[in-house]
Amino acid sequence: MAFVHYTVKKIVHGLGAIKEAANEVKNLKGSKAFIVTDPGLAKIGVQKPLEEALTAGGIEWKLYAEAQLEPSMDSIQHCTDEAKAFGADVIIGFGGGSALDTTKAASVLLSNEGPIDKYFGINLVPNPSLPCILIPTTSGTGSEMTNISVLADTKNGGKKGVVSEYMYADTVILDAELTFGLPPRVTAMTGVDAFVHAMESFCGIAATPITDALNLQAMKLVGANIRQAYANGKNAAARDAMMYASALAGMGFGNTQNGIIHAIGTTLPVECHIPHGLAMSFCAPFSVGFNYIANPEKYAIVADILRGDDRSGCMSVMDRAADVEDAFRDLLNDLDIATGLSNYGVKREDLPACADRAFAAKRLLNNNPRAASRDQILALLEANFEA
């Protein structure tokens, strides 16, 4: 069966790679760079190396430090308006998934008429976006490698995505030095998010030989390095491996979609303000427990990676696959991530609406290895409300 594989145009990877930022702006024929980040990063000055690199290279820049944790349609429009007023010819996303998603969505509106909700769905954007550089400061979302921007749907609740080949970055800069100061909590939940991206793509219906290779390597890197990065944020080797893993996973799931973990995790109540990576983390164990019987060969591999042990010579495929839920729970325990939706502000009366929204997320469920009804999703939520 024929398949098509897309990815970003250019990757600059390595410790200290941020110093190449001005050259990359010039390579895109730009001279005025609009930097999008969030208030928290700007407050502690994580973006300073980027600003210094641009200034040293003669690039005029403006900092927009208003990216929201859960980007809304209004916030995307505001970012776009500010970039237009500055006269930006290149937009740079600097931060975690929210800042990068804000940047990608704004890059669309800088070349296409808004509002952004016109483009919720797949390949509805008519014109190429403004040249875009993405620089992640976490190792998890993989947003820098994908063609999707996930936004809060303030009209209908939950989150929705704009998916378009025009949303691939022109250049991605991967510099793990930018992650050295991440708190352990953020390291944990973004790292698990990277693993979930790779796993859902690897086990999903749309997997290809190329995405399998990318996702398998990503999972191995996360499995071997996430605990070390969590325990010691200055571990350069572990940090670089996690940054690389996140990018590989992004290249993987960006070509296949995710599955039921994302279908559920992205439809939890917006007012709970649950970080994306955290939602993916605590939704993962019960979701893989539901899924594994549909693709035991691959879930056996996932379980072995989580355990750090190839058990193919001493356990059956089904026994290894059946261990995947417990193996995931053990990882979360090591990273001090609690399971149970009630721990994160979700109320029991929220569950039916969550199930409705998750079941409506066909873009995600269509790639899930096991078909899931609305009632099955609700049963999973209820069973794991206090788990």
Curated annotation (Swiss-Prot):
EC number: 1.1.1.433
Pathway(s) this gene product operates in, as recorded in its UniProt entry: Organosulfur degradation; alkanesulfonate degradation
GO molecular function term, any single one: alcohol dehydrogenase (NAD+) activity
SUPFAM superfamilies: Dehydroquinate synthase-like
InterPro entries: ADH_Fe/GldA (IPR001670), ADH_Fe_C (IPR056798), ADH_Fe_CS (IPR018211), Alcohol_dehydrogenase_Fe (IPR039697)
Pfam families according to UniProt: ADH_Fe_C, Fe-ADH
Catalytic reaction(s) noted: 2-hydroxyethane-1-sulfonate + NAD(+) = sulfoacetaldehyde + NADH + H(+)
Keywords of the record: NAD, Oxidoreductase
Domain of life: Bacteria
GO biological process, one term: alkanesulfonate catabolic process
Induction remarks: Up-regulated in the presence of taurine.
Job of this protein: Involved in an anaerobic respiration pathway that converts the sulfonate taurine (2-aminoethanesulfonate) to ammonia, acetate and sulfide. Catalyzes the NADH-dependent reduction of sulfoacetaldehyde to 2-hydroxyethane-1-sulfonate (isethionate). Does not accept acetaldehyde as a substrate.
Additional facts recorded: In contrast to some members of the family, a metal cofactor is not required for catalytic activity. Taurine is an abundant dietary and host-derived molecule whose metabolism to hydrogen sulfide (H2S) by members of the human gut microbiota has many prominent connections to host health and disease. The human gut bacterium and opportunistic pathogen Bilophila wadsworthia produces H2S when respiring sulfite (HSO3-) released from organosulfonate substrates such as taurine and isethionate.
Family listed: Belongs to the iron-containing alcohol dehydrogenase family.
UniProt protein name: Sulfoacetaldehyde reductase
Species of origin: Bilophila wadsworthia (strain 3_1_6)
